[in-house]
Amino acid sequence: SKTKAKRAPDPNPSGAEAWVPTLKERPKDKPFFLWLAAVDPHRDYAENVIPVPHRPEDVTVPPYLPDNAETRKDLALYYDEVSRLDDNVGKVMDEIAAQGVAENTVVMFISDNGRPFPRCKTTVYDSGIKSPFFIRWPAKVQANSTSQSLQSSVDIAPTILEIAGVEI
């Protein structure tokens, strides 16, 4: 009898391994909602998670962090994981396009906090609370537009329900 070889688990999972397979398996005749969360870019960081890693000597060190070899290495590894996350989001966007639903799909990309460095995550400094919040909705949001309005994650669920036509 044939047996499938088991793959060793990824020693440095991104948390995005199931994103595209999940999207491929969705019922194509129904609307869909996916909340995709990643491990990237959370600690502990791993080396070599992208083909061309960021070089510590090339990173920009924020003025509130010490500019030393340890900080530079930590920032480079953080940027590597952000890059891997970006690549995985790109794969999802490619799959949405391949399925022919890109023009009728609302995509939100958010982060719950700033990067996990001193004076960032868990603080009320801008570096802790100014986090990405992108929306792609071709029917309603002009590409490359920006907003200076205050946004909060508490608005996400009601907004999604309203978009879906659910009375709240």
Spans of model-derived segments:
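Extracytoplasmic mature domains of secreted/periplasmic and thylakoid-lumen proteins
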Residues: 15-19
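Active-site-proximal cap/lid insertion segments
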Residues: 1-10, 22-168
